[in-house]
Amino acid sequence: MKKTTRIVPAHKHIALVAHDNYKAELLRWVKENKEALQGHFLYATGTTGHLLSKETGLAIKSLLSGPMGGDQQLGALISEGKIDMMIFFWDPLNAVPHDPDVKALLRIATVWNVPVAMNRSSAKFMISSPRMTQEIEIEIPDYPAYLAERI
């Protein structure tokens, strides 16, 4: 597939997602990194977003709960170039009813070259990167070229 680029702004659009068994872990991480997160635009699936906003006071745009379509909403935002990175503390040991949605979300993040942190260690690396506060250029699929080839 042909590639093009897009500019990721210095003020990132960050998705915050956690399965039920990891909400407390994500909350702890957000509290520890509240100062670093304040300069960015935050999005979250419903239950997680309301919890994080209530407990930290951060402004978070809450979508629907994951099982009710929130994962798919995030995937759509990623496809539209409106999410720059995602912190997703998922539960690798327990299946959830919306596992196909989770897989689709991770697939679409990979397609559009969106960095995803799936645990505290990778989230720590991501949030502490000097690139967090810089404008950067990333490669993404050239969708118009893809469409032109298929029509």
UniProtKB/Swiss-Prot annotation:
The active site is at 71 (proton donor/acceptor). It comes from Aliivibrio salmonicida (strain LFI1238) (Vibrio salmonicida (strain LFI1238)). Residues 6-151 form the MGS-like domain. GO terms for cellular component: cytosol. One of its GO terms (molecular function) is methylglyoxal synthase activity. This is Methylglyoxal synthase. InterPro entries: Methylgl_synth, Methylglyoxal_synth_AS, MGS-like_dom, MGS-like_dom_sf. GO terms for biological process: methylglyoxal biosynthetic process. PROSITE patterns: METHYLGLYOXAL_SYNTH, MGS. It holds the Pfam family MGS. The keyword Lyase applies. CDD domains: MGS. It catalyses: dihydroxyacetone phosphate = methylglyoxal + phosphate. Its EC number is 4.2.3.3. The lineage of its organism: Bacteria, Pseudomonadati, Pseudomonadota, Gammaproteobacteria, Vibrionales. Catalyzes the formation of methylglyoxal from dihydroxyacetone phosphate.
